[in-house]
Regions:
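Residues on the lipid-exposed face of transmembrane beta-strands in outer-membrane beta-barrel proteins
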Residues: 81-87, 97, 143-148, 204-208, ...
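Transmembrane beta-strand segments of Gram-negative outer membrane beta-barrel proteins
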Residues: 26-62, 69, 93-99, 183
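Outer membrane beta-barrel
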Residues: 93-240, 270, 465-471
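Outer-membrane beta-barrel "beta-signal"
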Residues: 480-494
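Detector for outer-membrane/organellar transmembrane beta-barrel domains
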Residues: 76, 279-281, 335-350, 356-437
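Repeated loop/turn-to-beta-strand initiation elements of outer-membrane beta-barrel proteins
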Residues: 32, 93-95, 152-155, 213-220, ...
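Residues that define the transmembrane beta-barrel architecture of outer-membrane proteins
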Residues: 30, 44, 73-79, 137-142, ...
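Transmembrane beta-strands of outer-membrane beta-barrel pores
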Residues: 40-46, 101-105, 150, 161-163, ...
Length: 494
């Protein structure tokens, strides 16, 4: 408790110093410019208990992985400080640092939970994250890279995140970086997409604009991670957002030295922007193959949690090709978007008698078709942004005894529709937002929200997540029914 109070005061003091500096303009130390924000988030729960924390082999058990049974009061309460330090070293060379500091207070304010590690990183090569901390506090050097620009060449070297594609809510082309799901899964404000939860990795990234007359902005991009592998980071078992049932234990088997290699060509022809993409990398999500069974629950003290199925979490190499097209439909005042990828060797599991025995490969084709259009709805106010998306996932080959990485049976096709509305008011001081996602197998995610810009440095976000539907297979949106809840964020920017 004393340590938690100390960390709280440290973050408040750092944030206060940063905010005070904003009153005098941009904060500088020599040639370095410092910007960033401090944020406080409260995410009370309105749903039932998370079944993953109570799923024992013998059936639901209470209190399971929690200190006491029942639905929690909070899913998350945290504060964090995000800094961006930029230095221009010469006309062509610059350097960027992005340190972040987290303090998770959820366990302190909600006695439903035992002590768990809020920032687990149990895999070979965890030093690649540049993180340090304890159960409640985490400090990381999230990004660290050099930028070099000379003529048509742009080079970025270091720990960085790379975003391809523009799909909202689901990833099609945006699969270069794994995701950090340890705190909030991906249920934060949807309009921010995955910017805050992509895990930056060590890349050499080079862009070269190819001189030509037909396509003046024709650009080739190459990226290489020489083998500093980081998998998807999941919440700890026993935590509010735990995704792994209590009777499972996944041992990450991450092979360092496996490179990530990719490239794309982008350009504009008339009203059409296009990209052609290629990427090969170890699969981000662990593919859990049966390794052992721990039968400790059959011996005194007969604790049902002591019976566990142990899975070997493997990360086989995948290859992905794809592309995108954006069309500026001037007559309709709309942007038409399309993204597609094909992964010929996506990993699945051969599951016999509920036991994943080996990895099998199947081709997977993902496509998103989208329309974005600004439309004047409220007289005297800015236009409303309206975005509609259609997602399809097609899995080829035999699906007999086939399960995905969540352990769910696999459909040949899965279809999802999304609608996003954003209405700015009062010179963009207030923004009303609504995101809706509907899975045609009967599942949904609805997120209404409001954003209020208070002055020049303070922002208040109020949102609500609601999940539901009859489709509750693990990994489908209906399975997150327990994650219903409001969240409020106060952000002080500088």
């Amino acid at each position: 408790m004393q340590q938690g109070k100390l960390l709280t005061w440290v973050l408040f003091i750092l944030a206060w110093l940063a905010i005070e500096s904003a009153a005098w303009g941009q904060y500088r130390i020599g040639d370095f410019e410092i910007t960033g924000y401090y944020q406080y988030t409260i995410n009370p729960s309105t749903g039932p208990r998370n079944p993953n924390n109570f799923a024992c082999l013998t059936g639901p058990c209470s209190p399971g992985l929690q200190r006491k049974g029942g639905a929690p009061d909070f899913l998350l309460m945290r504060q964090f400080l995000d800094l961006n330090i930029y230095g221009k070293l010469s006309e062509n060379l610059s350097i960027t640092f992005q340190p972040r500091f987290f303090h998770d207070m959820t366990k302190s304010v909600d006695n439903h939970f035992r002590q768990y590690d809020s920032f687990p990183r149990n895999f070979r090569g965890q030093g690649n994250l540049l993180e340090a901390g304890g159960n409640d506090f985490n400090a990381e050097l999230r990004q660290l890279y050099l930028d070099y620009k000379e003529g048509n060449l742009w080079l970025r070297v270091g720990k960085q995140q790379i975003a391809w594609g523009e799909a909202l809510g689901l990833r099609v082309l945006d699969t270069i970086n794994p995701l950090d799901l340890r705190q909030f899964v991906f249920f934060d404000r949807i309009f921010e997409e995955f910017d805050r939860i992509r895990i930056p990795q060590w890349f050499i990234r080079a862009n070269y604009t190819i001189p030509n007359e037909a396509i003046p902005d024709l650009t080739g991009e190459f990226l290489l991670n020489p083998g500093a592998v980081v998998p998807t980071l999941l919440p700890a078992q026993g935590s509010p957002y735990n995704l792994v049932p209590a009777f499972l234990r996944v041992r990450e088997n991450v092979n360092q030295g496996e490179p990530t290699v990719g490239g794309r060509v982008t350009g504009t022809v008339g009203d059409v922007q296009f990209s052609v993409n290629f990427l090969t990398k170890p699969n981000d999500d662990a593919v859990g193959v049966f390794k052992a069974f721990n039968g400790g629950c059959f011996a005194p003290p007969f604790n049902p949690l002591d019976c566990q199925v142990i899975l070997d979490g493997r990360h086989p190499r995948i290859y992905t090709v794809g592309g995108s097209v954006n069309y500026n439909w001037t007559w309709a005042g709309a942007i038409l978007r399309a993204e597609t990828t094909v992964t010929p060797n996506a990993p699945f599991l051969r599951t016999i008698a509920a036991t994943p025995t080996r990895i099998v490969e199947r081709p997977v084709w993902k496509t998103v078709l989208a329309v974005d259009r600004p439309t004047y709805i409220v007289p005297g106010q800015d236009s409303m942004t309206i975005g509609f998306q259609f997602f399809e996932t097609f899995t080829g080959g035999s699906r007999s005894a086939l399960t995905d990485t969540f352990g769910s049976t696999v459909d040949q096709t899965a279809h999802v529709f999304t609608l996003f509305l954003q209405q700015p008011l009062f010179e963009k001081r207030i923004s009303l937002e609504l995101f809706t996602l509907f899975d045609t197998d009967d599942a949904h995610w609805i997120q209404p929200g409001i954003r209020w810009e208070i002055g020049n440095n303070v922002r208040l976000d109020l949102y609500y997540n609601e999940f539901g539907g009859a489709e509750k297979r693990p990994g489908r949106f209906g399975s997150f029914f327990w994650a219903d809840g409001a969240f409020a964020r106060v952000t002080f920017g500088f």
